[in-house]
Amino acid sequence: MGKRTNPRHFLVTWSLLLLETAFGLTSREVNKTLCIEKERDALLEFKRGLNDDFGRLSTWGDEEECCNWKGIECDKRTGHVIVLDLHSEVTCPGHACFAPILTGKVSPSLLELEYLNFLDLSVNGFENSEIPRFIGSLKRLEYLNLSSSDFSGEIPAQFQNLTSLRILDLGNNNLIVKDLVWLSHLSSLEFLRLGGNDFQARNWFREITKVPSLKELDLSVCGLSKFVPSPADVANSSLISLSVLHLCCNEFSTSSEYSWLFNFSTSLTSIDLSHNQLSRQIDDRFGSLMYLEHLNLANNFGAEGGVPSSFGNLTRLHYLDMSNTQTYQWLPELFLRLSGSRKSLEVLGLNDNSLFGSIVNVTRFSSLKKLYLQKNMLNGFFMERVGQVSSLEYLDLSDNQMRGPLPDLALFPSLRELHLGSNQFQGRIPQGIGKLSQLRIFDVSSNRLEGLPESMGQLSNLERFDASYNVLKGTITESHFSNLSSLVDLDLSFNLLSLNTRFDWVPPFQLQFIRLPSCNMGPSFPKWLQTQNNYTLLDISLANISDMLPSWFSNLPPELKILNLSNNHISGRVSEFIVSKQDYMIIDLSSNNFSGHLPLVPANIQIFYLHKNHFSGSISSICRNTIGAATSIDLSRNQFSGEVPDCWMNMSNLAVLNLAYNNFSGKVPQSLGSLTNLEALYIRQNSFRGMLPSFSQCQLLQILDIGGNKLTGRIPAWIGTDLLQLRILSLRSNKFDGSIPSLICQLQFLQILDLSENGLSGKIPQCLNNFTILRQENGSGESMDFKVRYDYIPGSYLYIGDLLIQWKNQESEYKNALLYLKIIDLSSNKLVGGIPKEIAEMRGLRSLNLSRNDLNGTVVEGIGQMKLLESLDLSRNQLSGMIPQGLSNLTFLSVLDLSNNHLSGRIPSSTQLQSFDRSSYSGNAQLCGPPLEECPGYAPPIDRGSNTNPQEHDDDDEFSSLEFYVSMVLGFFVTFWGILGCLIVNRSWRNAYFTFLTDMKSWLHMTSRVCFARLKGKLRN
């Protein structure tokens, strides 16, 4: 639901300000304070016990004046150290967070700091050591924070001596919290956090309620569902000052486990019950908490009844989060039940639920600043009735089924972020968008919007604009961008737009993300890109550019991560890519007219696509840089030649390599076999020769396509023993000889096996029925795409390979072949013997081609079990005997070729088999029956049930038909008017009938909604 303010921060800030005021600390006065020698030595001794790998204590000891050391503050009058603050700041520069922690032990030398009142050692690593007992002797402490610092053991009982303590934070350690008796001595304590430890204190409620000044209590992740206070303890509780209560992640499943909190109805202002397991209706008693301002119920299992009507009493509520609670409720009703807080509510989180209906007039909530409604079932309109001007600053309606036009957006002049993506909005983006002067993010992606107004150009604060995947039409000119000086992220992907700007146009922005695929920007290369110096992503694919690559384009920004110029008609040479400062690069220049030698590949390249161009010459330059980060390389369909260099062992992360359709020669490099992460290898249609090197280490390999080369030798046994993940194996059009190894039958995931056009001999293995996928009748195969890893949000870069296969007697290339095709092709070899009967067990097979071999014997009798078979080619063999009757059961069969064998007898009668051309059966001298000549002496069977008098039979049929239709009309007339007449005459019947219909309609509607909501919830969980 976005970044939220923790109430604890207000308390801490307030406490720190009080400390600063009380001790009169200013940086200017501290600098004049003289350090006390004894305390300086104590601090240096404390430093010696720590490991400072990040130099955070580098100032300690550089000068005599310890009051100027980092993290130290002294009293301006006495010089005593009063503040020791060594907490680590957590930063998240990328996708991982980092903190420069201190490690080691806490030295008892701190006892020399007798006047210390502020100690913060949080977010460090004290190596599972116990909290030093001597800290309990620092009696002047008012602030103690040891959270997230890897302390273990029990909390020292000596903490009872810290009677001046106002803030105590021991959260997120490995502490064992057994006894809290010491708490009752801390009469000044206002803030207590014990969450995220091994909580075992059964007496927790009794002891905590003895702390008279406690205002904020954090017991998150304490497993409190196991320690429910007794009714007697609750009745005797006297904690009347408690204002803020954090109970997140305690495995509460019913309200009875936290009902004690309603005893503090006169003081509680903030409650956090998020991330529990509450699965029933929300407790009505929340409505009795008259001072409640902040309520977080997010991420629970279910709020069956939605927002209860008692919430109308919460007139001070300004924050409510019910996101991801499986709330099923009509949205207008929900807003009605919150009407009591319409003047106070500022933040409302309802995302990830099953809310339905339209967006009501939210402008009635005059203080509402943030509204989260994404990922629901909203299926109506956006504000059917126009209201007053709204104070909303953040609105997210994405991932719903909202429809209709957008309202007048001028009603939301304070909006900073507007997320409307993944809906069904239609029409034009309203002109009023130009009046949202504070708007920073505008996302209308994945809708059906058609028009983009020029008023967009007035949004001087707009930073991100995403209108991708709509049906936007027309021409974009400079006017659409005239004042977008803050814009850094522009996404107009996959619309019907043309970008028409002056040749010398200089945009007012400096973009970081440029996504304009399928926008018509041609035919010239857009010169305004020369003015952009900071982009990390540039995608102008499918932009209808037919131009030479300009010389200035080689000056790419050093921040560049992703470059996509694919599917244009750009020509010219690419000599070298800029060396990016980033950890990785993705370059896609595919489907253009680039020529020349292979450009020098950047060392940080992760995805590199040059396929479908006119590059030529050697690719030896690929070895000049160690491109160990590369995960996917596609150089296919160019004019590269020569031997492929043997340097692939340095690309240990490579998952996809496609070198197909080039003029490579020589041997397949041995180092390819060292790529343990390789999933797909395409080297078909080259001139590789010699033996195939071992790929036994490539145990993740799913596609091995090496067809159309001059490889020799036997099919290696390691294919069957080590490549157990194979889904496609294509060795077609090579010079392999010997028999098909039976070990190949261990490839249980295999969907396509193509060994055609080789010199294979021997018998077909009888174990082909071990191909598990090919035995399954139900379902299609898996997709042939690979989600190649890379570090750019929103996720993986999809690589979809293609495959050259013989399908229905035609050689074709298929993308995503595995979604549908299940094929065995052993044609054009020298195989002998019979067709194994086990082959009929492959009931999921769609194409079987055994043609052009020397197979003998009969056609397998059980072939009729292969119900999904669409193509069967057994031609040009030595097969004999009759065509099995079961062949007539193959209703999907559209290609059949049994020609040029020694088959005999009559072709089985069926609509399917007789529909094929004569050529499907030709070359079988003893075969007869349609579509060939009829067999000699054949007489069609007589229908013994036929009538000897056809005319009489026809008359009977005519009479029966007439009688049937007359009776049907009379029956309908009597029944219809009988029921309708009763309803007209009898009013009570009429009312009952229509009430029944209305109730039935409502029941069906609500039942379907509830079932859908529950199913949606289960899928999310």
Swiss-Prot record:
Residues 1-24 form the signal peptide. Residues 985-1021 are cytoplasmic. Coiled coil: none annotated. Gene3D superfamilies: Ribonuclease Inhibitor. PROSITE patterns: LRR. Belongs to the RLP family. Interacts with EIX elicitor protein. Involved in plant defense. Confers resistance to the fungal pathogen T.viride through recognition of the EIX elicitor protein. This is Receptor-like protein EIX2. The lineage of its organism: Eukaryota, Viridiplantae, Streptophyta, Embryophyta, Tracheophyta. The gene is EIX2.
